[in-house]
Amino acid sequence: MKLLTTGKVKDVYDDGDTLVFKFSNRISVFDKIIPNEIDNKGESLCRTSAFWFQLIESYGMKSHFIELIDNRTMRVRKFAVPNKVSLGSSNYVIPLEFITRYYVAGSLYDRIKEGKVKPMDIGLKHVPEYGEKLIDPIFEATTKREETDRLLTKKEAMEIGGLTLEDYCEIMEAVFKIDRRIDMEVSKRGLIHADGKKEIALDRERRIVVVDTFGTADEDRFWDEKEYDNGRVVELSKEMVRQYYRSIGYHDKLYYARENGLPEPDIPALSDDMVSKVSDLYRMMFEKITGQKW
């Protein structure tokens, strides 16, 4: 096998007609790789992703998943990853991330606080609090292959992704359909699915294929349902790590540098105690998301 890429989460190998994903214990936030490794993380992401791929295929949706090789390695179908695509392109990974939001959280909350998103833009007459449920879900697209993810308009997403309006709407419908399945599963085990990301390829007939990973404690935001009903948001995903870096002021320093064209500060390491907590979280979340034993 030939190593193709070493990413923030996994190493990708070319194995002839297929690709092999080897999931690492690396962890990143805000497009920065943290100088710690997290035990259990790679296995949690790999096994959780395999669970979802097998589930959506049982409902007739296509994915690139072929098999689990071991608990941290999976084999997937290969698609082209071109630098530029057009409406005539096929058999390629769309260079976008598709994001669905059901609650006010993450970067949406930041944009509201900064005045970049007005309450009326999301169907509200008041400034929402963190964790407030949206009246209607939000579907967004961001860049995938730029140094930092950039939020796009629908027109920009269609141009960058080589998509027609029909393609874009079909992808949106497919992503919401997947999320309904996620909701059905995780609600059985006391979780709220607050938001998530998906990556999509188009096959040779330009049919939708779900690729990369989804529904894990990395890509998606999960909350404890019982705590939420009692008025408290308890983060059960990588958001716990993002909140840690917000609490120590790193997030504000980083984004100030990005917005003003300054050198970006290095991300500090997590404390040993935090590393242990995050490791336990990934192991626990595999069980709560899938209903399977570790």
From Swiss-Prot:
PROSITE patterns: SAICAR_SYNTHETASE_1
Species whose genome carries this gene: Thermoplasma volcanium (strain ATCC 51530 / DSM 4299 / JCM 9571 / NBRC 15438 / GSS1)
SUPFAM superfamilies: SAICAR synthase-like (SSF56104)
Catalytic function, reaction form: 5-amino-1-(5-phospho-D-ribosyl)imidazole-4-carboxylate + L-aspartate + ATP = (2S)-2-[5-amino-1-(5-phospho-beta-D-ribosyl)imidazole-4-carboxamido]succinate + ADP + phosphate + 2 H(+)
Protein name (database record): Phosphoribosylaminoimidazole-succinocarboxamide synthase
A Pfam entry, by short name: SAICAR_synt
Keyword hit for Ion transport: no
GO biological process, one term: 'de novo' IMP biosynthetic process
GO molecular function, one term: ATP binding
Family affiliation: Belongs to the SAICAR synthetase family.
Upper taxonomic lineage: Archaea, Methanobacteriati, Thermoplasmatota, Thermoplasmata, Thermoplasmatales
Listed pathway(s): Purine metabolism; IMP biosynthesis via de novo pathway; 5-amino-1-(5-phospho-D-ribosyl)imidazole-4-carboxamide from 5-amino-1-(5-phospho-D-ribosyl)imidazole-4-carboxylate: step 1/2
Keywords: ATP-binding, Ligase, Nucleotide-binding, Purine biosynthesis
Entry EC no(s): 6.3.2.6
Domain of life: Archaea
Matching InterPro entries: SAICAR_synt/ADE2_N, SAICAR_synthetase_CS
NCBIfam families according to UniProt: PRK13959.1-1 (NF010564)
HAMAP family, per the entry: SAICAR_synth
UniProt GO cellular component terms: cytoplasm
Keyword Ligase among record annotations: yes
